């Protein structure tokens, strides 16, 4: 077996990536989320494939085809709820994975980090288009509002929006193309994940101390395969409790009403995992400014390596920046809450304050805290 594992061209690649891969001996459970994201992606592709066998991407039948899946297809309700809640689990793992990267300074592996940001954008685009497919009220109005934001782009905006819609409003052409893109993007994401791993294995994994771990490596299998397996079991338990007992807890009741272009819901909002960015978008009264802030709320991650002022890589031994980090996490929770609230006092001012705090902590306060810590520790 060892001979095949080390000699066969294809198995050799798998061996170097998942079996004999040298890994730091001290990486914690925060490093489990990469494998959990792979599991989420696999679940989404499989459940999505079975849903696509029964779904019809036509405005007149899309809503009823989803109802048909839940009522008439064998275990269709389970496949549908696994797919819907799988997206939520995917984003929970994504946010924790990115949060780990920020906390432990993994952004210093620039190629891996930038590929991760591209992946984040791709997953967000896929999830947005998937939310449109059931063709409920929130699907239709969410698609209308979010795609309409592109009209803020000077000169080409209106043309671009009509080009994406395939007409003068969100209609049959929009739904069909969103289904096509929603189907193909997960496979593109899978290819990008392999590139992400390729870049990661060029440098090797980071670790909680942020120090070079070349002198103390252990093989990935069996140590981290077993450790990842524990994470997988916990994730699947949470996932199945969510899908079987509380399938609609993270959804919007409005999406159980078929799309009606003549009736606008009182509060148009995206899925919970976009609410923080939606709150930042709404906090700026100007349309173009809001769109730029929305894009920057994610793209600001690309500036992380440039904003790193500390002589230490991780936040493990940096209490001042640690405090800033946890304030940032709390701020993101506030933004998520505000994104789901109506646009009225006091939510408007809270959203604007939280949005300013979000950018200020990342761009100003954390770099300053890093310099202060350098001075305290005489690292200059």
Swiss-Prot record:
| Superkingdom | Eukaryota
Where does the UniProt entry say this protein principally localizes?
mitochondrion
Ligand binding (a ubiquinone): 201
The UniProt entry, under InterPro entries, shows: Cyt_b/b6_C, Cyt_b/b6_C_sf, Cyt_b/b6_N, Cytb/b6-like_sf, Cytochrome_b, Cytochrome_b_C_euk/bac, Cytochrome_b_N_euk/bac, Di-haem_cyt_TM
Q: Which residues form a coiled coil?
A: none
Question: Per its UniProt record, what Gene3D superfamilies does this chain match?
Answer: Cytochrome Bc1 Complex, Chain C
Key words of the record? Electron transport, Heme, Iron, Membrane, Metal-binding, Mitochondrion, Mitochondrion inner membrane, Respiratory chain, Transmembrane, Transmembrane helix, Transport, Ubiquinone
Q: Which CDD domains match?
A: cytochrome_b_C (cd00290), Cytochrome_b_N (cd00284)
What's a BP term from Gene Ontology annotated to this protein?
mitochondrial electron transport, ubiquinol to cytochrome c
Query: What GO CC annotations are associated with the protein?
Result: mitochondrial inner membrane; respiratory chain complex III
Transmembrane region(s):
33-53, 77-98, 113-133, 178-198, 226-246, 288-308, 320-340, 347-367
Report the subcellular localization.
Mitochondrion inner membrane
As for membrane topology, the entry says: Multi-pass membrane protein
Report the function annotation for this chain: Component of the ubiquinol-cytochrome c reductase complex (complex III or cytochrome b-c1 complex) that is part of the mitochondrial respiratory chain. The b-c1 complex mediates electron transfer from ubiquinol to cytochrome c. Contributes to the generation of a proton gradient across the mitochondrial membrane that is then used for ATP synthesis.
**Which family would the database say this protein is a member of?**
Belongs to the cytochrome b family.
Q: How does it assemble?
A: The cytochrome bc1 complex contains 11 subunits: 3 respiratory subunits (MT-CYB, CYC1 and UQCRFS1), 2 core proteins (UQCRC1 and UQCRC2) and 6 low-molecular weight proteins (UQCRH/QCR6, UQCRB/QCR7, UQCRQ/QCR8, UQCR10/QCR9, UQCR11/QCR10 and a cleavage product of UQCRFS1). This cytochrome bc1 complex then forms a dimer.
Q: Could you tell me what this protein is called?
A: Cytochrome b
Q: What is the lineage of its organism?
A: Eukaryota, Metazoa, Chordata, Craniata, Vertebrata
